[in-house]
Amino acid sequence: MDILKVENLTKIYGKGENSFKALDNVSFSVKRGQFVAIVGPSGSGKSTLLHLIGGVDRPDGGHVYVDSNDVYARNDTQLAIFRRREVGLIYQFYNLIPVLNVVENITLPVLMDGRKVDEERLEELLTVLH
């Protein structure tokens, strides 16, 4: 079963003669448990692709399906929940919030989503980090 399916994904930045097609009808699928690497030179559309898969930006054409659900059939509120609960993007250069300690950095996304921190899971994570 496909956990991710990208169909004819297109993203254009700018308008008219100043427009730039960052993605042009990109299609692929990923099966559950499969590992994928997205590689290419600077400016080849890797970040744009990931932003569209993760619901950070909206495509100009095409579809993204995560677990058979169309990511862009959601409204903005539903997309925000999707980003918080269903996908995660880790950038090459990520930053922790320097004024927060380790526990606060780990629990911040859960608290921002209005959920209670699972103390048992937190202890497991801290054990791994230690």
What are these regions (language model features)?
Residues 54:
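Helix-to-loop junction immediately C-terminal to a conserved catalytic motif
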Residues 39-41:
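The feature captures the beta-strand-to-loop junction immediately N-terminal to the Walker
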Residues 17-20, 71-88:
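ABC ATPase NBD coupling module
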Residues 1-3, 12-25:
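A short, flexible loop at the N-terminus of ABC-type nucleotide-binding domains that lies
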Residues 100-109:
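Short coil-to-helix segment of the ABC ATPase nucleotide-binding domain corresponding to the Q-loop/switch region
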Residues 69-70, 117-130:
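Conserved ABC ATPase "signature" region
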Residues 62-70:
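Conserved ABC transporter NBD signature motif
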